[in-house]
From Swiss-Prot:
Name of the protein in question: Propionate kinase
Residues annotated as binding Mg(2+): N11
Cofactor(s), by name: Mg(2+)
Organism per entry: Salmonella typhi
GO biological process, one term: L-threonine catabolic process to propionate
Binding site for substrate: R86
Gene Ontology annotations for the cellular component aspect, listed alphabetically: cytosol
PANTHER family assigned: ACETATE KINASE, PROPIONATE KINASE
């Protein structure tokens, strides 16, 4: 065992590799960065926010070699004891994180058509990392596995049975690593018994989802077979009547591919505001009186509140509502507006606590006492992946959840 073991966490996206290096003993981040623009002339590597390093026309293995070189420069290469990979979709094959083997890779490849943009990139990262670090144990952490505890009535669509039985069409849910991390932190912050508790976690970012967590398990979530369903998001429509899309196709002559692009890339906050998918831009426009920016935010908030209240029906009790993700952690306005919609659930906002910046970390933002506690808990998916790797890799370390 290395005297100073670290975990390398890798998240390969469709055009980028996000990575971080965490101390096994404390889970403190020692190094983090992103290789972006894969397979283009503009590809670059940025570490700890420093000046970008040119990686023109690099593929995933080239980028990981560059990351490994930076590790070596910092005398960290020999300290890499474990590697954790974020995997987008596990189909119905995995209920928890697993040690990566050839068989596991084959199974991930089998379900990759369910998330082709991400899973194949994830596999490229695994293949490259196994070649670069052949002696290091590697772990796959699935974004969907936390939701494998959903009951059939929560994951089935009202479609002919053969679409589920033959094609696997069902709700899978996403942001599972975030929902799992945040719910576990909430038990401590809210002083709850995990086995007798009910939480709603609202992961709000450019992608956004709600999760109902009952007694430590996901029992309902807003995203579906793909990350398109549920809340309105930065550029995604969220829930939309399929009949409306069929009517648009008929009236405009657009193809299925055209409409997939519309609901994934041209809708949501961007589509309604006509201004931006960035909530920070829209909040500024809100205060300047931009009518469609205000309408986009109001629609976003209405969808969040409606899904939070609806997901509460999957719980036996409601102890807390937790905001996380880039918007959930940082937007005072969105939290305020959502909570104003949820008075029916017994929520009362502490206005001053809600105004505290995210640098204050985990914090309760409802008045005391409150029928339902409302809190902000910054997510840390990298730490959750590292903790899973530490646990599965049998590395002894004084860390929570391990």
């Amino acid at each position: 065992m290395n005297e100073f073991p670290v975990v390398l966490v890798i998240n390969c996206g469709s055009s980028s590799i996000k990575f971080s290096v965490l101390d096994v003993a404390t889970c403190d981040v020692l190094m983090a960065g992103i290789a972006d623009g894969m397979n283009t002339e503009n590809a670059f590597l940025s570490i700890n926010g420093d000046k970008p390093i040119n990686l023109s026309h690099s593929n995933y293995e080239d980028a990981l070699k560059a990351i490994a070189f930076e590790l070596e420069k910092r005398d960290l290469t020999d300290s890499v004891a474990l590697i954790g990979h974020r995997i987008a979709h596990d189909g119905e094959l995995f209920t928890q994180s697993v040690i990566i083997t050839d068989e596991i890779i084959d199974n991930i490849r089998r379900v990759s058509p369910l998330a082709p943009l991400h899973n194949y990139a994830n596999l490229s990262g695994i293949d490259a990392a196994r070649r670069l670090f052949p002696a290091v144990r590697q772990v796959a952490v699935f974004d969907t596995s936390f939701h494998q505890t959903l009951a059939p009535e929560a994951y089935l669509y009202g479609l002919p049975w053969e679409y589920f039985s033959s094609l696997g069409v069902r709700r899978y849910g996403f942001h599972g690593t975030s929902h799992r991390y945040v719910s576990r932190r909430a038990y401590e912050l809210l002083d709850l018994d995990e086995k007798n508790s009910g939480l709603i976690v609202a992961h709000l970012g450019n992608g956004a989802s709600i999760c109902a967590v009952r007694n430590g398990q996901s029992v309902d979530t807003s995203m579906g077979m793909t990350p398109l369903e549920g809340l309105m998001m930065g550029t995604r429509s969220g829930d939309v009547d399929f009949g409306a899309m069929a009517w648009i196709a008929k009236e405009t002559g657009q193809t299925l591919s055209d409409l997939e692009r519309v609901v994934n890339k041209e809708s949501g906050l961007l589509g309604i505001s006509g201004l931006s998918s960035d909530l920070r831009v829209l909040e500024k426009a809100w205060h300047e009186g931009h009518e469609r920016a205000r309408l986009a935010i109001k629609t976003f908030v209405h969808r969040i509140a409606r899904h939070i209240a609806g997901h509460a029906a999957s719980l036996h009790r409601l102890d807390g509502i937790i905001f996380t993700g880039g918007i959930g952690e940082n937007s005072v306005l969105i939290r305020q507006l959502v909570i104003e919609h949820l008075g029916v659930l017994g929520l009362t906002l502490d206005v001053e606590m809600n105004k505290q910046p995210n640098s204050h970390g985990e914090r309760i933002i409802s008045v005391n006492p409150s029928q339902v506690i409302c809190a902000v808990i910054p997510t840390n998916e990298e730490k959750m992946i590292a903790l899973d790797a530490i646990h599965l890799g049998n590395v002894k370390a004084p860390v929570e959840f391990a």
